[in-house]
Amino acid sequence: MLVGGMPQAVNAYLDTNNFSKVDIAKRRILKLYEDDFLKIDPSGRASVMFRSIPGQLSRNAIRYVPYSAVGKVDDDKMTELLKDLEDSKTVNMCYHVDDPQVGMGLTKNIEQFKMFVCDTGLFITLAFWDKKFTENIIYEKLLSDKLPANLGYVYENLVAQMLVASGNELYYHTWPRDEKHYYEIDFLLSRGAKICPVEVKSSNYRSHASLDEFCRIHSSRILWRYLIYTKDYAKDSETFLIPPYMVPFI
């Protein structure tokens, strides 16, 4: 998860066993991405939108807000920027479904979405871009789960990457809990004539209020329900609790 799957990063880890060297390799890759973004969009907005992905996800907002990253842009230009980013294959787009059911594309909301980085190793480097390189100590704390940060968004990015690699399109769903808060299902999968809601946790925390409420409302539409967390496989009533490495098999 920390190294990612880019060949240059993997080779750097195998050759040096040093996360700082790995991070330098990943920064070179991201610099190439940035150069390509500038060819597509000389204004630099596409590059800024890409770099802002970790920050947008860490806010636990229900959508990516492009205007908070690049300021005021006319709607046609924003549509073009988003299309260019999606076509670049450097990001995985996850669209909101207004009515979660089989045929989720029918109620796909193209104005409400989240963006994930195509490679979680690159995502880690982007998240800690404020340093010249991400030091070994940060990687070690990430490995031991001792970094004082909410890492839920890292696991969301990882799950998004694995779901796309397994041939899934990405969808999510939110609905009001009260006047100020929302329930959220991180990912929705279509399986046969049913759907499978997926919730992602960054620890062994087993609470799943959103999952329970979603399945109560849409009980007739549910095939399986999954909570992805950092412990071993288990089952909590009707909910399958699975570690991230099992995601390709759901």
Regions found by a protein language model. Give the residues of each.
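Amphipathic alpha-helical segments of the small helical/lid subdomains adjacent to P-loop NTPase cores
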Residues: 1-5
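Accessory nucleic acid-recognition modules appended to NTPase machines
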Residues: 6, 10-184, 189
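Switch/connector loops and helix/strand junctions flanking conserved nucleotide-binding motifs
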Residues: 125, 208, 234-238
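Conserved catalytic cores of phosphodiester-cleaving nucleases, focusing on short active-site segments
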Residues: 159, 163, 185-204, 225
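Active-site-adjacent loop/helix micro-motif of nuclease/hydrolase catalytic cores
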Residues: 203-213
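Arginine/glycine-rich "motif VI" loop of SF2 helicases in the C-terminal RecA-like domain
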Residues: 214-221
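Short, hydrophobic beta-strand segments that form beta-sheet elements in well-ordered domains
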Residues: 223-229
